[in-house]
Every structure is written in C-alpha cells, then in structure tokens.
C-alpha cells in the first residue's frame, strides 16, 4: 500500500466518504488540513457549517479518493446532520486528550453517528493532541477500553506533529476497501455459480489487521 497527494488526471477506482466528528476545538480542521494537504496552522478558526477536502491514495494497486468531511462541533450547526452523514463509509470520532469533557461527549457523538450513518460504517476513535502529553486529562486506557467495548478502531494522534495521523486514516480506508472488495468478490462468485460455463479461479482477498465488520456493503463508485 502506498499513499500520496494524488494526480488530478489519474483514474479513480473508488471514492470513500469519511466524516470527522467531535466537539468544537478538538482539532478536526487541523486533522483534515494535515491529511489532505500536509499543512498545519495554529490560527485555524472554528468551522462554520460543513467543508470537505480530498486526497487520492493507492491501496492494493487501486486508486482511492478519500473525501474527508469536516463539520462544526457547535450545537447550532447540528441541523446539517442527516446530509453530513449520508453516504459516509468511514468516521473519525475525535476528542482532545487534554480536555476530559471532549472524551465524555464521545458516546453522544457515537450515538448520533450510528443513528444517521450506515450500520457498517468503519469508525476510528481518535485521541488528538498527543504533542500536549504533559496536559493529558484522558488516560489512554480509558479510550482503549471504550473503543474495545464499542467495536471501534483506536489511535492517539497529533495533527501538529503529524503523529499517527496517516496510520489512522489508512487503517480506516483500508478496512473500507477490504469490505467493498469482499462484497464484490461475493457478487462475482454468485454470478459465476448461476452460470457454470463462466466458473473460473477466484482471487481470495485477505483482510488487513483490525476489526472484522459483519455485513459488507459496497458504497462508492469509481
């Protein structure tokens, strides 16, 4: 698997929509800027409404466009909820490791996500701002325990230092890719079984490490 910032002229095999959710000021906008453009600004202003950026990567020799959506964490912007989650196949559930309240609000964000998104959405619990370790208010073990209980992936990151951010997104995108391909493989097998003359050897796709998600759903178009 390789990653990059993409070539606008290259053929796109898949488009995966991933949403960033969590309280205001946990670093969602910085996470988006770091992943999409490899940029970081301490002067980043609070998001108004919704915005998204894209980045194209190569996963298992296929070109995948990641469409990353960022939304305001403030309650007054929650009217965008349904449209924001529509079509999302991945989510980064972000809290600030230096602000306990942002972690305590994660169950509410997760409940909202599960109420509006596809039931098989791939979710990464993301503890941001590890560059402020001396101000930590959320023990890593608390987040690990919550992620395990809820069946989520989990990583701690720093948008400022670009620590583990790539890993977090690639884990989510690769898991989505595997789910989509396993669904496609099953569809191919069903088609072959209905037409004995077309039976051929099938390539078995072995999923990468991480959560095995029941019920696969193809969600994106090339």
UniProtKB/Swiss-Prot annotation:
GO terms for cellular component: endosome; Golgi apparatus; plasma membrane. It holds the Pfam family Ras. Its main location: membrane. It is a lipid-anchor. The keyword rRNA-binding does not apply. It is found in: Cell membrane. GO terms for molecular function: GTP binding; GTPase activity. A lipid is attached at residues 219-220 (S-geranylgeranyl cysteine). Keywords: Cell membrane, GTP-binding, Lipoprotein, Membrane, Nucleotide-binding, Prenylation. GTP binds at residues 22-29, 70-74, 128-131. A motif (Effector region) lies at residues 44-52. CDD domains: Rab11_like (cd01868). Gene3D superfamilies: P-loop containing nucleotide triphosphate hydrolases. Coiled coil: none annotated. NCBIfam families: small_GTP. Belongs to the small GTPase superfamily. Rab family. This is Ras-related protein Rab11C. It comes from Nicotiana tabacum (Common tobacco). The gene is RAB11C.
